[in-house]
Amino acid sequence: MFGSGNVLPVKIQPPLLRPLAYRVLSRKYGLSIKSDGLSALAEFVGTNIGANWRQGPATIKFLEQFAAVWKQQERGLFIDQSGVKEVIQEMKEREKVEWSHEHPIQHEENILGRTDDDENNSDDEMPIAADSSLQNVSLSSPMRQPTERDEYKQPFKPESSKALDWRDYFKVINASQQQRFSYNPHKMQFIFVPNKKQNGLGGIAGFLPDIEDKVQMFLTRYYLTNDRVMRNENFQNSDMFNPLSSMVSLQNELSNTNRQQQSSSMSITPIKNLLGRDAQNFLLLGLLNKNFKGNWSLEDPSGSVEIDISQTIPTQGHYYVPGCMVLVEGIYYSVGNKFHVTSMTLPPGERREITLETIGNLDLLGIHGISNNNFIARLDKDLKIRLHLLEKELTDHKFVILGANLFLDDLKIMTALSKILQKLNDDPPTLLIWQGSFTSVPVFASMSSRNISSSTQFKNNFDALATLLSRFDNLTENTTMIFIPGPNDLWGSMVSLGASGTLPQDPIPSAFTKKINKVCKNVVWSSNPTRIAYLSQEIVIFRDDLSGRFKRHRLEFPFNESEDVYTENDNMMSKDTDIVPIDELVKEPDQLPQKVQETRKLVKTILDQGHLSPFLDSLRPISWDLDHTLTLCPIPSTMVLCDTTSAQFDLTYNGCKVINPGSFIHNRRARYMEYVPSSKKTIQEEIYI
């Protein structure tokens, strides 16, 4: 095994370790040990702690550390063999990461660095940290008995006074670079999924998604939404809550009794459990879709059922489109196998802090550490606090977000850009975000050689922008510039011809941006969407005309339409009599402008859905293996949603700041927004052209 003489490896029978494991793992941490899990623990303890595993405290300390990691990862109650191996491997990886930062040149041995597979690879042994929570082992002397002072010695922690550099925690992450995690609904935890290219898959297999990705895409969305609903405060202590309760309220109104109302609780019922339960009231959660008959249906992992929305009363303030997750209440009739919906709403949202705490503070973006098969990086709470304090101190940092549709082939837009860049050059921002489309005409393959091709014109447009930027040295030297592609930009426009293409959209190819790369010191060609990690904040940038798509595909409810007809008839009758009630002439104090209502509806729908594109594939195609880059779980700290079909807005929902700069040119004015991350405030700016 190993050449060190401090540990004498022994073979421990699992029943001998059971009393000690039961005392630590079961009684103290409430875990249950399976026989194969106990065998794996006995094998590790015998190999790495040796013959003195009963006398010294090393075994107890290892079991306590093992249980802490197991509970932190939320692996459940039962300790099995595969879980033991994964947790032990992660404990090794954690000590490697900690050791590489704190003691990079020491080469002693830690008991977590010893495995059976290392017998012929002694050069790969992990060094032991002098501050490890497990006792150090001498290479030349037998295992010493620790003193009382050593037993209660706390692990070494870096000094909190060590200065942090904000540049180390500022990173732009494209869709292809974002780490992928799959969701296990049974264990209710995220599992790291390695990149195909890292697995050595070459050729087409490394680029095309698997059919399994297609299957898991909507299943993952459903399970994440279902778990979020069950974490809602109204579902706490039990899953018996009905957020709609329209039928019960109607019954109470008809009875007109003052006695104590009965509970209107209902459980979320799987669709398959509707069979045989005729004329009963249910609460369902599922995906809104159309079946093969062309009628509306609701789907969940257990099945699907046709729904009747002729008498549905939807909750106001949401968009209902095919592909979104909805909560519906109604009555199921076995005749026709149809579910008659009485009420419909979207699942409730959840704040970012609650979601992060639930998933164990996973570092999904890989800023504080890169995850792999054996190690899952997590956000350090103390570091998050220090980053937040540093963020508050950097009051001079600001992000400038230009409006969308920066047509570089339009002379009017180039003139406006010149004025804005001149103003920004005096006080350069930390970040300058450019959002496409960067050409007014979609770039496509030209069938004629008489005129200049559209791709050549596309490159010339960026060369002209590089010439313009070269006049502002202060800006190009001190500002990081991010370019987000639009629907008219390459390569997606070659297929979509300016229509909405597949998400996520790849960055603009480097063949068209060489001159800008030479002029600008810090430039990032990002995907759409893209994410920015800035200290303690996560910022999502998404360029899409979502408001227009929601309005085109929203579900129309016949009951609401009939009410609108009655209202119009009443208005016509009141006009004929020339008598207008005074309350119709006075605006209600809580009545909001139409634009504000539309923007709130847009933001609430996206964040409550937990997805940037809650549509069916037929309405908005998505790369199956990159659907995780569109997921908003947890919701970001700030989201830049650039939508030219919606009004310019700035609002906060569930702690998430949502900004829409709108179109760049509007009524002979060039518009942009300044975002100050230290205070999370925005300033709307405009320049007349």
Curated annotation (Swiss-Prot):
Positions bearing Phosphoserine: S122, S141, S613
Subunit annotation: DNA polymerase epsilon is a heterotetramer consisting of POL2, DPB2, DPB3 and DPB4.
Gene Ontology CC entries for this record: cytoplasm; epsilon DNA polymerase complex; nuclear replication fork; nucleus
Originating organism: Saccharomyces cerevisiae (strain ATCC 204508 / S288c)
InterPro entries: DNA_pol_a/d/e_bsu (IPR007185), POLE2 (IPR016266)
Biological process terms in GO annotation: DNA-templated DNA replication; DNA-templated DNA replication maintenance of fidelity; error-prone translesion synthesis
Keywords: Cell cycle, Cytoplasm, DNA replication, DNA-binding, Nucleus, Phosphoprotein
Family to which the UniProt record says this protein belongs: Belongs to the DNA polymerase epsilon subunit B family.
Region described as Disordered: spans on this chain: 98-155
Modification note: Phosphorylated in a cell cycle dependent manner during late G1 phase. Phosphorylation may facilitate the interaction with POL2 or the activity of DNA polymerase II. Phosphorylation is independent of DNA replication but dependent upon CDC28 in vivo. Both Ser-141 and Ser-613 are phosphorylated in vivo, but in vitro only Ser-141 is phosphorylated by CDC28.
Protein's name according to its UniProt entry: DNA polymerase epsilon subunit B
Composition bias, Acidic residues: 116-126
Ranges of compositional bias, category Basic and acidic residues: 98-115, 146-155
PANTHER family, per database record: DNA POLYMERASE EPSILON SUBUNIT 2, DNA POLYMERASE EPSILON SUBUNIT B
